[in-house]
Amino acid sequence: MIETNDSLRDCLAPAKLNLFLHITGRLPNGYHALQTVFQLLDWGDTLHFTRRDDGAITRGTDIVDVPADADLTVRAAKLLKEHTGTREGVNIEIDKRLPMGAGLGGGSSDAATTLLALNRLWKLNLPRAELQVLSVKLGADVPFFVFGKNAFAEGIGEELEQVQLPPRHFLVVTPRVHVPTSAIFSEKELTRDTKPLTIADFLAQHSCSAEWPDSFGRNDMQQVVAGKYAEVAQVLRWFDNIAPARMTGSGASVFAAFRSKDEAVAAHAKLPVGWSGAVTASLDTHPLFAFAA
């Protein structure tokens, strides 16, 4: 990351994995009640922010099918500007690396990186807790990225408690299909009554064993998504001969954990021609964590 008085460049918006994802019921507001553990990755989009003196908020990068006003980075900047009353503006550029509709939290992470970066660039000095509350308006996963640590999450994903996770390398494979989260949540076949657990349950069973992630929990969305999207089912079957694997979020990405980078790279080398995969490592802390107190 490169910082000047008027810009912040090369700001990583890290991807996330859901190490498990249980749907435990419905909340009074109609949203689904979830339990999950979020794992940060050292892989993601890269954002660049340049202060504007005219107060305008602009996006200097074209993204297919995402108009600027709908972009979560622009929405985050406008939300922060409105919340604080600052007269500052910003131009945002995005090097998009994460696939959309993949369950990796790309848009949500971009939004959180925007809030953290502008808290610094605009010299707002808002506390992290205030940014987290504000970020709920942008999406259920955004508060986690503002929180900035690997976390056990409940509610819609905004109730967060830090967890210490062992270092790992991952192979993440993303089939060429976009899975709309809202549509999966609407499926009648979706499990919505998984028994709630405690963070102690997770920590007691979670390990670096060869059986992980099969050794703890599941992704309640995986069976439904694999049934609707043959591409996801195909990736899961491919992993059967490589390592235990699981879908992250509502898909479409599927991941497996490895104890070393060499093991992950060796698995990546076996990918069928035309498949998209990335070898990445775990992160303990968001790269912009220090930008909020």
From Swiss-Prot:
Annotated protein name in UniProt: 4-diphosphocytidyl-2-C-methyl-D-erythritol kinase
Keywords for this protein: ATP-binding, Isoprene biosynthesis, Kinase, Nucleotide-binding, Transferase
Binding-site residues for ATP, renumbered to this chain: 99-109
EC number of this enzyme: 2.7.1.148
GO BP field: isopentenyl diphosphate biosynthetic process, methylerythritol 4-phosphate pathway; terpenoid biosynthetic process
NCBIfam families assigned to the protein according to its UniProt record, in alphabetical order: ispE (TIGR00154)
Enzyme class name: transferase
Record InterPro entries: GHMP_kinase_C_dom, GHMP_kinase_C_sf, GHMP_kinase_N_dom, IspE, Ribosomal_Su5_D2-typ_SF, Ribsml_uS5_D2-typ_fold_subgr
HAMAP family in UniProt: IspE
Domain of life: Bacteria
Entry's Gene Ontology molecular function annotations: 4-(cytidine 5'-diphospho)-2-C-methyl-D-erythritol kinase activity; ATP binding
Name of the gene encoding the protein in the UniProt record: ispE
Pathway: Isoprenoid biosynthesis; isopentenyl diphosphate biosynthesis via DXP pathway; isopentenyl diphosphate from 1-deoxy-D-xylulose 5-phosphate: step 3/6
The keyword ATP-binding appears for this protein: yes
Pfam families to which the protein is assigned, alphabetical: GHMP_kinases_C, GHMP_kinases_N
Task of the protein: Catalyzes the phosphorylation of the position 2 hydroxy group of 4-diphosphocytidyl-2C-methyl-D-erythritol.
Recorded catalytic activity of this chain's protein: 4-CDP-2-C-methyl-D-erythritol + ATP = 4-CDP-2-C-methyl-D-erythritol 2-phosphate + ADP + H(+)
Similarity remark: Belongs to the GHMP kinase family. IspE subfamily.
Catalytic residues, chain numbering: 16, 141
